[in-house]
Amino acid sequence: MKNNRILALSGNDIFSGGGLSADLATYTLNGLHGFVAVTCLTALTEKGFEVFPTDDTIFQHELDSLRDVEFGGIKIGLLPTVSVAEKALDFIKQRPGVPVVLDPVLVCKETHDVAVSELCQELIRFFPHV
């Protein structure tokens, strides 16, 4: 791979079994330079496993910070809200030649369902770009 810079649009898994921790570890093991824009945080609370979306403004600032980086690939993981998904889609649309992998999380292993009804419709909009 000529360009070894890979971007993960991923959530933070507090148990490090998935999300951005796993993405960055995989990139490192394969000699790639990983970048990340955090889509959400997670926590195990009295309510169970919870997903806390990154504030829209903060997520946009993350993407804006990466605007001038040329990536060899982009991997999309957990997109917790329609607005975060829209921002991610706008970002990848600006990079038409960059390979994109869409690996969405729709149901967390810990049995907490991420709100998916509107989000599924938004994810369909990614298909022409991945």
Please provide the spans of the model-predicted regions.
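Small-residue (G/A/S/T)-rich helix-start motifs and N-terminal tracts that mark the onset
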Residues: 1-73
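Conserved residues at beta->alpha junctions
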Residues: 10, 78-79
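Conserved beta-alpha-beta core of the PfkB/ribokinase-like small-molecule kinase fold
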Residues: 76, 82-130
